[in-house]
Design a protein with these regions (language model features):
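Conserved GNAT acetyl-CoA-binding A-motif
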Residues: 71-84
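A conserved beta-strand-loop-helix scaffold within acyl/acetyltransferase catalytic domains
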Residues: 8-25, 30-49
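Acidic/histidine-enriched, beta-strand-rich ligand/metal-binding domains
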Residues: 46, 55, 91-94
Length: 110
């Protein structure tokens, strides 16, 4: 997207870092992606979201690649891990991640 900018934001309290995609033509936040820097040199890749009107335009990939390049430049020697949906798995495998156990979400209202 021509009018898209990505801003990097860090938090002090929770060790979270995020990137936000902004459509400059209307100042709308159209996507975000997070990571959590943990103890013992680990980083957990967290959720990502893209506004429904902006999906299928490469914004998720752009956010993911921006975060990935940042990690490669700033966290050499860290172990990166993620819990991901089936739709995100091909990108993680493309980047050299190895799959672990399959986990199934369950819930019950009581």
């Amino acid at each position: 997207m021509e009018n898209l900018t990505i801003s990097h934001i860090t938090t002090n309290a929770q060790n979270l870092e995020m990137w936000v995609a902004i459509d400059q033509s209307n100042s709308l936040a159209v996507g975000h992606i997070f990571m959590n820097v943990e103890k013992d040199n680990k980083i957990k890749f967290l959720d990502a979201w893209v506004h429904s009107d902006y999906r299928r335009q490469g914004i998720y990939r752009l956010l993911w690649e921006t975060r990935w390049e940042y990690v490669l430049e700033n966290y050499k020697g860290y172990t990166i891990y993620a819990w991901c949906k089936e739709t995100s798995l091909p990108l993680l495998i493309e980047k050299g991640f190895e799959t672990g156990e399959i986990v199934t979400y369950v819930e019950k209202k009581i």
